[in-house]
């Protein structure tokens, strides 16, 4: 079982340097995040090592409007990822938001909420529900 992770860095008027994006990507990779492939996300296309989150040296000083770090993490490693994000946020000069993607289960995501609380992350007061209309459900 895994959670989807998306870290949306930068905003209009603020942006983000890829150097800061690399710091976050490498921190969460070391904590267990596995990044989406270059076919799935543009950021992976500029990584020299998709396992570590290392970005090409020649573009680290590029300033972008925004960029999303996307991947997955095993449920039992989410706490480590949250701690990595809290640690690296002090070393970057931009804003970011964290998204966690979870399939609703019989336990109403109590383990997710407990993990967030245990690591000092405020519980969300809103969410997005995709009911799967328009596409067949995954049968894989």
Sequence positions of predicted segments:
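Helix N-cap motif at beta-to-alpha junctions
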Residues: 71-78
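Ser/Thr-rich, low-complexity intrinsically disordered terminal regions
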Residues: 34-58
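Residues forming the flavin
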Residues: 7
């Amino acid at each position: 079982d895994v959670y989807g992770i998306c870290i949306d860095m930068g905003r209009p008027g603020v942006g983000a340097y890829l150097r800061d994006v690399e710091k976050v990507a490498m921190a969460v990779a070391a904590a267990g995040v596995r990044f989406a492939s270059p076919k799935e996300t543009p950021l992976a296309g500029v990584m020299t090592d998709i396992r570590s989150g290392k970005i090409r040296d020649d573009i680290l000083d590029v300033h972008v409007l925004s960029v999303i770090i996307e991947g997955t993490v095993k449920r039992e490693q989410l706490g480590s990822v949250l701690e990595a994000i809290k640690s690296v946020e002090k070393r970057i000069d931009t804003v970011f938001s964290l998204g966690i993607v979870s399939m609703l289960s019989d336990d109403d995501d109590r383990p997710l909420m407990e993990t967030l609380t245990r690591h000092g992350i405020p519980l969300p007061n809103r969410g997005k529900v995709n009911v799967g209309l328009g596409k067949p459900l995954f049968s894989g």
